[in-house]
Amino acid sequence: MKNIKPLADRVLIKIKEAESKTISGLYIPENAKEKTNIGTVIAIGSNKEEITVKVGDTVLYEKYAGAAVKIENKEHLILKAKEIVAIIEE
């Protein structure tokens, strides 16, 4: 994997892929899937005082937050820590 280190109060998140099948078993084509706003924290910036999440946390972030980047053909976001609205506990 490319070594991307967010700066300051930014966080790198791997976006959770949208479901490819409905509950009833119908397949959803790639172009019809909705973008999720849930992801996993991959890396955090150096300003740890302002960052309340840690690597490995599953988080909910604002819908239009951050800058999209592709790493190894997977969608990721680099966003400010304040754009994360919740930690999802399993």
From Swiss-Prot:
GO terms for molecular function: ATP binding; metal ion binding; protein folding chaperone; protein-folding chaperone binding; unfolded protein binding. It comes from the Bacteria. GO terms for cellular component: cytoplasm. InterPro entries: Chaperonin_GroES, Chaperonin_GroES_sf, Chaprnonin_Cpn10_CS, GroES-like_sf. It is found in: Cytoplasm. Signal peptide: none annotated. Keywords: Chaperone, Cytoplasm. Belongs to the GroES chaperonin family. This is Co-chaperonin GroES. It comes from Borreliella afzelii (strain PKo) (Borrelia afzelii). The gene is groES.
